[in-house]
C-alpha cells in the first residue's frame, strides 16, 4: 500500500530547526478518518504537548466529514498520539531540559493507518529565517543558471 501524504507543515520548517523526527499513531474517530482520506487536514497551527503522561496533538484541524452526523467531533480537538513509553520519556526529558518544542511536520497514511511525524524543534530567530530564505534563493538562482546554460 505504501505511504500517502495527507498534509505537510511547511510553516514548521520556516519557524523551527527540526533536530529529530519520530512517527506516532493517532487515536481518531471514524468520521475523522473518512475526512482525512479526502485530504481535509491542516497542520499549520498544530503543536504537541505531554499531558498526564500522554502525548497529545492540539490545534490539528480535521474538517468535519460532510456526510457525517452528530458523531462529527470538534475539528481542532486534542487528539491522543500513540508512542512507546521509552520514546515518550525521551521526548519529555528533551523538552524539559533544553526548552525544545514538539511540532507535527507531516500527516500521512501508512499501510492504511494514520500516522503523524513529530519533529523535536528549536525556534528560529528572525535573522535565522532571513538567512534560510537567502540560501534558498541562492540555490534557486544557481539551478536556474545551470538550467539556462545547457
UniProtKB/Swiss-Prot annotation:
Q: Where in or outside the cell is it found? A: Cytoplasm
Q: Which SUPFAM superfamilies match?
A: Small protein B (SmpB)
Q: Which cysteine pairs make disulfide bonds?
A: none
Looking up Pfam families in the UniProt record yields:
SmpB (PF01668)
Q: Which Gene3D superfamilies match?
A: 2.40.280.10
Q: Which GO terms describe its cellular component?
A: cytosol
- Identification of the protein by name: SsrA-binding protein
Lineage of the organism? Bacteria, Pseudomonadati, Thermodesulfobacteriota, Desulfuromonadia, Desulfuromonadales
**Name of encoding gene:** smpB
Amino acid at each position: 500500500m505504501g505511504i500517502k501524504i495527507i498534509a505537510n507543515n511547511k510553516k514548521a520548517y520556516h519557524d523551527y530547526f527540526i533536530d529529530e523526527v519520530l512517527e506516532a499513531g493517532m487515536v481518531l474517530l471514524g468520521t475523522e478518518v473518512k475526512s482525512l482520506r479526502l485530504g481535509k487536514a491542516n497542520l499549520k497551527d498544530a503543536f504537541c504537548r505531554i499531558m498526564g503522561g500522554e502525548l497529545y496533538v492540539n490545534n490539528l484541524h480535521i474538517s468535519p466529514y460532510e456526510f457525517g452526523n452528530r458523531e462529527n467531533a470538534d475539528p481542532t480537538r486534542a487528539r491522543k498520539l500513540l508512542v512507546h513509553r521509552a520514546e515518550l520519556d525521551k521526548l519529555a526529558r528533551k523538552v524539559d531540559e533544553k526548552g525544545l518544542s514538539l511540532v507535527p511536520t507531516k500527516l500521512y497514511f501508512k499501510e492504511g493507518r494514520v500516522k503523524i511525524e513529530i519533529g523535536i524543534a528549536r525556534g528560529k530567530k528572525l535573522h535565522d529565517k532571513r538567512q534560510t530564505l537567502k540560501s534558498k534563493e541562492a540555490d534557486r538562482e544557481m539551478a536556474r543558471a545551470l538550467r539556462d546554460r545547457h
